[in-house]
């Protein structure tokens, strides 16, 4: 799957006569970074605008067993001490175009009402919030976890559609479940999770914007300036995404577009969808590895007590349930992936059809110009490519006839009425 992703974007790096085909006016730049050295010093602030079409869902696991749970023989139980098994739950998300975005950076979020807040996670763990003008937002509550670590902020800087204060949180937990009025940023996987009320507001208003920083690009990553509005944090240059059609004059007052831009053929989310598939597969493999670990521990002497064996047996039972859920989710991911891949294939087919249409127009223009050239060549031949002696003879003959006609006419005019009376 990873090779498929690499191969897909590599096609966007093709060049003709030393100029890259899919990068608009920047024909000297490839679509992807060709090496880690090329990507080393790249640092962009990227702005992505979303509509309801970008909303998707993901499956998270509840009561799932971690490696620490296994090593500590921690069996999942409810408040009454009853063993509970892993389960799944669906959460709403907006998937960013990139994973591994900068965690200690600024996330500028604009909701459907135009409310803008810049949430900065500082290196010391604190979180600061500023408005669109850069002023500190008042009335913000800082949230912490059980260990006192800051997890997010709550305030009235966004709309959830019902007037409630919205919480913006940061997490690295891939199984995090947001509250109804919560926006959760997972910079590691490049996701913005939306609580139920926030999701409904985004879906109804059809508008949401996220601005984020990314500085850890690597070989094979797509250049963001080809897809989004960006600011180069190294040079300060601002890139505004717009159509960069290269046109040639092929006839009088007739131009033809000769290039295809990357976003017209190569969907940047192809790679993210591949990431979802690999994640689903890896999750199954990880659970199988955990099950093998538990089975191995059950054979060890130090876990031979009845209590330890009971705990390991309960954990193994939970992992078995977790494995069934993971395999089911993997199947659904691949079923969904088939439809997504068909959509990407259709996008490429449409781009190819557009190129074919332009080739047809060019051929028609060429045929028409060739016909016009033939007609003008024929006319030129009829007017210029003739026998000079024959022309002189014809001209002299015509001149004699003309002069004779003039002479006869003059004699008739010289006669008067008196010449006929007598």
Task: Label each PLM-derived region with a short phrase.
Residues 156-166, 221-229, 380:
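Short, positively charged
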Residues 37-52, 182-347, 351-354, 373:
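Polar, low-complexity export/assembly segments characteristic of proteins
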Residues 1-33, 317, 321-422:
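Amphipathic alpha-helical polymerization modules
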